[in-house]
C-alpha cells in the first residue's frame, strides 16, 4: 500500500513542481510569496497533495502511514516513535516552507505574470487527486488486492 500511495502522491507533487518551474523558472521557495490569491487552483491542488503526503486522514497517504506505523509499533517501538516524530517534523516543514513561503503573505510583483493551471494540467492531475481521495476514504479494493498477492507469496515461500 505504501509504495502505491507514495507513487500516486509523489507523481502529483513532482508534476506540481514542474508546473511552477515552467512558469517561474525557479524552485527557490523563498523567491515566492502570496501566490494563493494569484493561482488559487494550483494552491488548492498543492494543499490536497501535500496533505496526502503527510498522511492526513481521508487521503490515501493516511492508510499507508497508519499500517507502517502500526506494524512497526509492535515490532520495534523505538523506530515507531522515531517515525512518529518524522511525521510531525515533515508536517511542520511542509506547512512552514511551502505554505508560508510560497502561498501566504503579500504577492510579489515579480510573479504578477504567473497564471493558474491550464485545463490540460488539471486533467492530468485530477486522476491522481481522485485516487488519493477514493483510497483515502475507501481503501478496501487496493488492500484486498495486496492481501491476496501477499497470501499467495507467503504460501509459496512456506512450502
Where are the predicted features?
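Functional transmembrane alpha-helices
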Residues: 1-114, 135
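Cytoplasmic/organellar membrane-interface segments at the starts of transmembrane helices
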Residues: 39-41, 95-159
Amino acid at each position: 500500500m505504501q509504495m502505491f500511495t507514495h507513487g500516486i502522491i509523489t507523481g502529483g507533487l513532482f508534476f506540481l513542481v514542474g508546473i511552477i518551474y515552467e512558469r517561474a523558472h525557479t524552485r527557490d521557495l523563498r523567491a515566492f510569496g502570496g501566490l494563493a490569491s494569484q493561482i488559487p487552483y494550483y494552491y488548492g491542488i498543492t494543499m490536497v497533495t501535500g496533505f496526502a503526503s503527510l498522511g492526513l486522514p481521508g487521503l490515501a497517504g493516511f492508510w499507508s502511514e497508519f499500517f507502517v506505523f502500526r506494524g512497526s509499533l509492535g515490532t520495534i517501538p523505538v523506530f515507531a516513535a522515531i517515525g512518529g516524530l518524522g511525521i510531525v517534523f515533515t508536517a511542520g516543514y511542509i506547512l512552514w516552507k511551502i505554505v508560508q513561503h510560497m502561498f501566504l503573505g503579500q504577492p510579489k510583483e515579480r510573479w504578477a505574470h504567473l497564471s493558474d493551471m491550464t485545463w490540460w494540467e488539471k486533467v492530468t492531475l485530477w486522476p491522481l487527486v481522485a485516487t488519493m481521495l477514493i483510497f483515502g476514504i475507501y481503501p478496501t479494493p487496493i488492500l484486498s488486492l495486496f492481501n491476496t498477492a501477499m497470501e499467495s507469496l507467503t504460501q509459496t515461500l512456506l512450502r
